[in-house]
């Protein structure tokens, strides 16, 4: 399936914190805040093209956020294999590092937003990463 881009979006590649090459969709904003969007379970068809992720991405863009939606390891053009939710924390850390490097000193607020499996990975990352100012989980799993 071709990747749909919103106006101003570009396709990017960046490394996970453990060295895998991941694909993403970046839309820059003038404001000093940025969000990483994490998709639902890869083994059940989740990707950065999931409608809930694309809707959240649009809402954050309308609120003035730079957005980075990406495919976890093993999804689409991202390298690697599914890591049961634990290895994917390295993917989110890599996305945050990419935003830091790309945007420089501009962002003062980094956020992570996830849907289902992505909310689980986002929560684990937010609990361990001081760069994250807030976390948004949509339909988080309750028994993981």
Regions found by a protein language model. Give the residues of each.
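An N-terminal hydrophobic leader/cap segment in hydrolases
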Residues: 1-15, 20-27, 110-112, 117
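Homeobox/homeodomain signature
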Residues: 2-4, 12, 38, 107, ...
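Serine-hydrolase catalytic machinery in alpha/beta-hydrolase-like enzymes
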Residues: 15, 20-105
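Primarily recognizes the serine-hydrolase "nucleophile elbow" in alpha/beta-hydrolase
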Residues: 90-144
């Amino acid at each position: 399936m071709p990747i749909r881009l919103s106006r101003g979006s570009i396709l990017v590649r960046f490394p996970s914190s453990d060295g895998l090459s991941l694909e993403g969709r970046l839309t820059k904003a003038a404001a000093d805040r940025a969000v990483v969007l994490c998709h639902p379970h890869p083994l059940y068809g989740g990707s950065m093209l999931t409608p809930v992720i694309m809707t959240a991405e649009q809402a954050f863009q309308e609120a003035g956020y730079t957005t980075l939606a990406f495919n976890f390891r093993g999804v689409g053009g991202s390298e690697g294999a599914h890591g049961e939710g634990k290895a994917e924390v390295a993917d989110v850390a890599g996305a945050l590092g990419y935003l830091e490097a790309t945007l420089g000193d501009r962002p003062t607020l980094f956020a992570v937003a996830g849907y289902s499996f992505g909310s689980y990975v986002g929560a684990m990352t937010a609990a361990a990463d001081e760069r994250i100012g807030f976390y948004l989980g949509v339909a988080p799993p309750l028994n993981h």
